[in-house]
Amino acid sequence: RQFLADETGIETAYTELIPEDATEFRTVAEAYIEQGYNIIFGTTFGYLDAMAEMAEEYPDVIFLHCSGYLKNDTNFGNYFGKMYQPRYLSGLAAGAMTESNKIGYVAAFPIPEVIRGINAFATGVKEVNPDATVEVVWTFTWFGPEAETQAANALLETGVDVLAQHQDSPSTGIAAEAAGAKWISYNTAYGQDAAPGAFVTAPVWDWGPYYVEIVESIINDEFVAEAYWGGMETGLVSLYELTSDVPTETASLISDRTEEIISGSYDPPIVEEEFIDNVIGTVNP
């Protein structure tokens, strides 16, 4: 949002931590519309139905939903990135670094986005270490430091020595550092500062350029209500720099795979209905 404001000079505003509830979202969105805002970004999956309904009710407002799948032909689109690509790369690092062959994954909700990310990560793990397993614990929250800490500690108690996450707090990393384990973060802000001794790398987002592109298309009357899914070739998703703890051979492999993904010559498999065979857990908890 700040990148968008800096690059375009347009006025932006935001509200954080709106519950995934249609009434709550509608209250906030309608308040913005009444103030004259005519582009509404909803950045949580749970806003899907409310945004679809509001797009019909407010045809002069553009609604853009992050991580969803609904759209119309005029004023409602969705956008997301192929986060499974850098998650696969981070799995290569995790598989090479585990000594116990037990890797833990603290995950929010069993939805397709999260499941395909876990499977892509586990694909990377398996490529470099066929003996390693990835055990998943669900927290049922995107941001819940206490629940994340409990899940991380439960995994660590089983002998896990590398933790990964699909969560919005650094609690998993803090638990990993306290136990002497390694940590694959999620977004750089939760990485080196929160648990520098555990941090290895992180799949990361860079939303700014996309926001500028889509808003400029609206300003120029070139907007198309589409389902946008950008991969590593767009810069929307990437793998943060590796620490020196990652073995040189593995770092070289990650570099090669990164080039292959960007060029289009390789793409990790997308599996989101069930877990692949080296994952311990269930998609229907």
Where are these regions (language model features)?
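A residue-level marker of the well-folded mature domains of exported/periplasmic proteins
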Residues: 1-285
